[in-house]
């Protein structure tokens, strides 16, 4: 769409009452038409939310647009060609005739923009997935048929997008959330920022989790046959396969010559030992989308105990050889280009990095080490061992109780209840609320933009219904119906968005374009261009719309706290507001019932290997520090704080608490986890260390009686 400078340009705002042009506003604020109606703190909060939004399954375009959405879309993750040229070589990571899927394709091209005296070569890394978070990621969506044009001796067109984020629509708009029917209503579920959400609506916010797991074998250890049978040894799922229901992605067993006769039988190799094996858990049912196997070639030159037993490495060797073949093709291509172009050869930095990595991965042309010398291959300063296996898998993340949602005005809340369609509040005509939030939240937070957005979308819905009624009037011929429908829309635009009305008068002059606009409204409703510098945006503009159209509201039928259906005495509004989901979810717990401890009796520090050694979290994300203790002491008696600190650090108290949790019929209702008559305070290991040092100096601590009786 062509943008005229006299309409959209910043030079036309001076002398106006509202000068909040999108070019004057910062990131985030220029996405909000009601930037001048929200408090500064809530506007800043929404800006911080932009970095917390995952890619969701079924996003939609917002009904009220500022015009910057497509500009945001230009800066999302894409796989695109940077310069004009010709594709020279295409290399797959895993050939499809040998493997089920191929997670990566490398397209090497020669640029045609650097003259004949410079041979500039680059590469496009076409990977099927993107991960920039500890678990949230997304699978790239192919852009049309552009991937089919990636062939040798085919032209490479600058700017051509091969694949992109699923958040972009066909027009390039960045879609972060979903336009949702919201109801602001006082319910027992909406207090304290609670959100009552519709299950079918939450399914639209399903996102993709992508994680990786690593196993290092060969240092007197090996992968057991978790996913194989008597004839095929598989230490992990195949590419394109899924992690089994038990959740174990890989299991590593130490090699013991004395126990090999019982630990390395076909039956024993297929059964994990939950006590002595190093288990690496993933997500049950997750699909493996990438596998990378690294190998230390220096171990091949000597016969030592660090090599994997024969036959056990057949799966690892197959993936390693396929990846090794791709890296050797890169090296062969580089040497071919050197012979062909000599000093005129210039490599794109990313291509240069890949060539360097290929030499390191394949150990190509390396200096032969003397017999008996030890030069070990490392990856990020960690020894590779005989084999280093990296699995990448994906799984669905479905929002649940505990997930956090927010409006584009910083009006966030936490899902506390999920309801079916018949449990959600609704109008008599069947309009169902997708979510229910506190009716006073926008007032208390001073983010009135949330109220204005809901009302504006309600008016747009009413005008859309007027257009549909006109188009169903059989007393008019087709041309008259379209003419009247377009006139209704233009009248609405003149009130709701004068800038959009003026823009359409200048650009949409042909009858066919007007018919096309009416058809788009009939198909998907009204989308308003409503920049934040619109005059009188907010309460004044809403008042004009209400005087002209009247705000349609109805009584709401809802399920009360007694499980009975009730009808509200007052009429209430159910209309669309744009809702985004934040990375806060309900399945990643921050605390644990019992922490993991060292053999010294104090809390253990978790390593990368320990993080996934059990299905759940071993330790809390944060232990109690000085600041937390002082806050607790300000509110609680000192003996309660001492008891809280004693339980995880006192071996006897910790053992008693674990036993109480395991043996309790309902672990959420334990009358007494630690009996202090049997296990008194003072067994904290940290206190015992201090007490021991003081004893060596002739000092002892004891409780003294208070004047009011009892001990202090």
Describe the residue ranges of each PLM region.
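Long insertion/accessory domains within large nucleic-acid-processing enzymes
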Residues: 1-712
């Amino acid at each position: 769409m062509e943008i005229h400078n006299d309409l959209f340009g910043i030079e036309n705002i001076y002398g106006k009452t509202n000068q909040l042009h999108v070019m004057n506003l910062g990131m985030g604020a220029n996405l909000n038409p009601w930037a001048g109606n929200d408090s500064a703190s809530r506007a800043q909060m929404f800006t911080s939310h932009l970095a917390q939004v995952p890619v969701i399954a079924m996003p939609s375009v917002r009904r009220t647009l500022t015009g910057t959405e497509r500009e945001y879309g230009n800066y999302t993750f894409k796989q695109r060609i940077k310069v004009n040229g010709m594709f020279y070589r295409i290399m797959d990571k895993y050939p499809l005739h040998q493997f089920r899927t191929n997670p990566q394709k490398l397209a090497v091209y020669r640029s045609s923009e650097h003259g004949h005296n410079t041979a500039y070569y680059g590469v496009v890394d076409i990977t099927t997935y993107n991960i920039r978070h500890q678990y949230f990621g997304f699978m790239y969506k192919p852009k049309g048929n552009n991937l089919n044009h990636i062939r040798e001796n085919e032209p490479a067109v600058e700017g051509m997008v091969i694949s992109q984020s699923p958040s972009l629509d066909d027009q390039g708009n960045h879609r972060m959330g979903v336009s949702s029917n919201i109801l602001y209503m006082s319910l027992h579920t909406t207090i304290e920022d609670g959100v009552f959400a519709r299950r079918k609506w939450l399914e639209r916010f399903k996102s993709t989790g992508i994680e990786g797991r690593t196993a290092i074998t060969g240092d007197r250890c090996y992968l057991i046959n978790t996913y194989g049978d008597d004839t095929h040894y598989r230490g992990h799922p195949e590419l394109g396969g899924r992690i089994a229901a038990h959740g174990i992605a890989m299991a590593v067993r130490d090699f013991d010559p004395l126990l090999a006769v019982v630990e390395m039988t076909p039956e024993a190799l297929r059964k994990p030992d939950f006590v002595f094996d190093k288990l690496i858990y993933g997500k049950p049912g997750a699909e493996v989308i990438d596998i990378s196997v690294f190998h230390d070639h220096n171990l091949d030159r000597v016969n030592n105990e660090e090599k994997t037993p024969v036959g056990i490495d057949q799966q690892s060797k197959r993936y390693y050889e396929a990846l090794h073949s791709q890296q050797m093709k890169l090296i062969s291509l580089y040497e071919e280009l050197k012979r062909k172009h000599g000093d005129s050869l210039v490599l794109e930095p990313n291509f240069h990095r890949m060539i360097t990595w290929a030499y390191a991965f394949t150990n190509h042309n390396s200096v032969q080490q003397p017999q008996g010398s030890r030069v070990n291959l490392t990856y990020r300063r960690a020894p590779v061992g005989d084999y280093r296996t990296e699995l990448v898998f994906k799984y669905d993340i479905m929002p649940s109780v505990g997930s956090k949602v927010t409006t584009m005005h910083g009006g966030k809340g936490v899902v506390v209840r999920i309801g079916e369609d018949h449990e959600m509040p609704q109008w008599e005509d069947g309009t169902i609320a997708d979510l229910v939030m506190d009716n006073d939240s926008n007032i208390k937070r001073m983010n009135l933009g949330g109220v204005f957005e809901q009302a504006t979308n309600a008016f747009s819905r009413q005008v859309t219904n007027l257009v549909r009624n006109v188009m169903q009037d059989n007393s008019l011929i087709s041309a008259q119906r379209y003419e009247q429908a377009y006139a209704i829309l233009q009248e609405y635009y003149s009130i709701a968005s004068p800038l959009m009305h003026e823009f359409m008068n200048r650009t949409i002059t042909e009858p066919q374009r007007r018919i096309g606009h009416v058809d788009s409204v009939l198909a998907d409703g009204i989308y308003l261009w409503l920049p934040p510098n619109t005059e009188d945006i907010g309460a004044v503009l809403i008042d004009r719309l209400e005087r002209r159209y009247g705000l349609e509201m109805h009584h709401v039928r809802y399920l009360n706290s007694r499980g009975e259906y009730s009808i509200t005495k007052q009429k209430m509004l159910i209309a669309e507001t744009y809702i985004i989901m934040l990375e806060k979810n309900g399945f990643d717990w921050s605390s644990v019932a019992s922490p993991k401890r060292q053999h010294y009796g104090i809390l253990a520090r978790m390593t990368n290997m320990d993080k996934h050694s059990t299905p759940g979290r071993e330790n809390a994300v944060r232990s109690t520090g000085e600041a937390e203790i002082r806050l607790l002491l300000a509110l609680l008696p000192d003996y309660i704080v001492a008891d809280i600190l004693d339980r995880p650090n006192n071996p006897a108290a910790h053992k008693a608490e674990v036993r109480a949790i395991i043996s309790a019929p309902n672990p959420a209702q334990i009358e007494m986890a630690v009996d202090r008559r049997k296990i008194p305070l003072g067994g904290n290991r940290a206190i015992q260390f201090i007490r021991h040092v003081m004893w060596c100096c002739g000092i002892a601590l004891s409780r003294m009686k208070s004047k009011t009786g009892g001990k202090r």
